[in-house]
Amino acid sequence: MITGTIARISGPVITARNMTGSRMYDVVWVGRAALPGEIIRLEGDEAVIQVYEDTTGLMIHEPVENTGVPLSVELGPGLLASIYDGVQRPLPALYAKSGNYISRGIMVPGLDREKRWAFNPVKKAGEMVQTGDVLGTVQEFHLVHSIMVPPGVSGEIKTIASGEFTVTDVVCTLADGTEITMLQRWPVRKGRPFVKRLDPEVPLLTGQRVFDTMFPLVKGGTAMIPGGFGTGKTVSEQTLAKWADTQVVVYIGCGERGNEMTDVLTEFPELTDPRTGYPLIERTIMIANTSNMPVAAREASIYTGITIAEYYRDMGMDVALLADSTSRWGEALREVSGRLEEMPGEEGYPAYLATRLAAFYERAGRVICAGSEEKTGSVTIIGAVSPPGGDFSEPITQNTLRIAGTFWALDANLAYRRHYPSVNWIRSYSLYLEDVEDWFSEKVARDWYQFRGRAMYILQKEVELQEIVQLVGPDALPDKEKVVLEIAKIIREDFLQQSAYSDDDSFCPLEKQYWMLKIIIWYYDAIRAAMRRNVPLRQLLSIPARSEIARMKEQRDLDRLKRLSDIVWEQTENLEVQTCSTAA
């Protein structure tokens, strides 16, 4: 083991001498307190190390020990429903050791070494296996956890066990003597191997109308949620974590307030997944690196989360990774870069900011997993961005924009008007619309894309008309343009607006979304058809069905909702008859 000494201390960055033979990203123990750190630069016999603990009290000439291995995470049964810090130390175990505040230098393994798991083998002695093949399964809550052959390992099975084991017990031995346990270790900065990347063509359904219908995201895609203070980034991320159509959710609190992680911990055990009926906490893995924790560990928390997500992807599962927020990671990069005395880029961020962001987001994807059996899994990354003052021209927002396929722009003005989710429908976009068009046409309705396009046209037309209204008032507009304003208002208030705290409206099934939008567009068509027959606009906007349209989001009976479209046409037709008979 290489042992050096501390030569310089600058906040979370220290320089150690006599480190010849060390490699980049090796984990080291710093000082007599054995603080964990990672080598981020090598210069001659000196190593520059970022420390994942508070460096207060460290002194020059204290020892630095190189472990010789990169920063890695432990992968295996026991990850689900766990909460870790940025370097995969389980917070409940840290609390048991040190109380409310984490003491420095405490290292606890990521997976429980005492708990026993029932291992059911699916392979037999004499069979050939390769990287990614499933050796057996373990029941982890309601999910079947596959125990796979680790990357880089293959051969003939010599023995395979059955029964209850801890994660460190050997469950399989290969003919060449390789022993396989239920525990794998994998370096966080290196993506796990797969066979082939697939086209993103299956939408990630979230139960949120503005996301699913207007700006869809795909499984294996990337999305960003930028917004200023109070625009609803965290509530949006938590809503996606609750209702996303995935088997596993990895929620990373990167530099955010501790109360937000507390919300997740208190709410998720009480909420049930609408698709499985099981508590949401049983499919969630939380990584809490709150704002008062060391800044260097923010980068580690991001990489820890994506590595865990890739592990479940390799089992053939769909995984959603939610990072809240990547801006705090960027700020940590800026602080460490300043300590390293590197040449600053735009707004003080390091020149390699775009490279780091791209390397993270590119680990998303829908892939054919490694192994002889064909499995398809996906990792979808949704990153919140917190631009100072809501300024979308700042570097992190701009660099993420180049990478992300879906852009959900949160608007402070909408948030102040209590319109949630406060997604600005003019500034937001999705690059996946054409990819999911066939899926929606086959699974939902052939005219889904048409209705969505017409709704977007009405909303864009409203923005143009609002400029005229501000100058001359709404009464100066002709009736055909007043209709556009009224229907746009219905789309905004009765379709796009959705309460995260309503039992009836927090999750909206896709078929219900389609029928809600269809009824609104049909109402628009019915009004225009009746106006051509000289029916007064005032009467058309006050038909009894108008109040039913406003209450669609609370309507649980889909058949009753479908009948509403016929009621709309009947009531507008009856108005025409009444108008004609009155004129006669």
Curated annotation (Swiss-Prot):
Gene source species: Methanospirillum hungatei JF-1 (strain ATCC 27890 / DSM 864 / NBRC 100397 / JF-1)
Compartmental location: Cell membrane
Gene encoding the protein: atpA2
PANTHER family attached to this UniProt entry: H(+)-TRANSPORTING TWO-SECTOR ATPASE, V-TYPE PROTON ATPASE CATALYTIC SUBUNIT A
Protein name according to UniProt: A-type ATP synthase subunit A 2
Pfam families documented for this protein: ATP-synt_ab, ATP-synt_ab_N, ATP-synt_ab_Xtn, ATP-synt_VA_C
Record-listed ATP binding positions: G227, G228, F229, G230, T231, G232, K233, T234
NCBIfam families: PRK04192.1
Annotated EC: 7.1.2.2
Keyword Chloroplast: no
Subunit structure comment from the entry: Has multiple subunits with at least A(3), B(3), C, D, E, F, H, I and proteolipid K(x).
An example Gene Ontology CC term for this record: plasma membrane
Membrane topology: Peripheral membrane protein
Single Gene Ontology MF annotation: proton-transporting ATPase activity, rotational mechanism
